[in-house]
């Protein structure tokens, strides 16, 4: 029987929570700090043990990073989408996932690209049972090839 490393579980929980916060911000117009505080308040009111507490540092970095670099992130994501797809055409939760994954690929080189992609695909699986996780995988893989080509074997 395998056990999950607590720090890995906390980072996974932070990614899931970041998507929820980014979604809340888009749906309600809440600013970054208000949305982060609301999420913290909700977690404090929840019974313990349902899932790992998120790594608050990573949660805050993702949400603040996406918020601060939204235009650049959307440019990267838009170029990674195929055909006539645009960032705006993506459903809001899916948009939050690819934005957060794109931010992590661009801003956290300490997270290996393949780990980053896998983690965000897992987040997509938490919300979707259809083709959406495949879209997340494709977009983030394209971005990883662009942003971290050497790590992904491109141009090596």
From Swiss-Prot:
Q: Which Gene3D superfamilies match?
A: NusB-like
For whether the record's keyword set contains Lipid metabolism, the answer is no
Q: Does the keyword Iron apply?
A: no
Q: Which UniProt keywords apply?
A: RNA-binding, Transcription, Transcription antitermination, Transcription regulation
- Look up the record and report any one GO term of the cellular component aspect: cytosol
Name the Gene Ontology molecular function terms of this record.
Answer: RNA binding
Q: Which InterPro entries match?
A: NusB-like_sf (IPR035926), NusB_fam (IPR011605), NusB_RsmB_TIM44 (IPR006027)
Q: One of this protein's GO BP terms? A: DNA-templated transcription termination
- Pfam families in alphabetical order: NusB
Q: What does this protein do?
A: Involved in transcription antitermination. Required for transcription of ribosomal RNA (rRNA) genes. Binds specifically to the boxA antiterminator sequence of the ribosomal RNA (rrn) operons.
Describe the family membership recorded for this protein in Swiss-Prot or TrEMBL.
Belongs to the NusB family.
Please give the name of this protein.
Answer: Transcription antitermination protein NusB
What is this protein's gene name? nusB
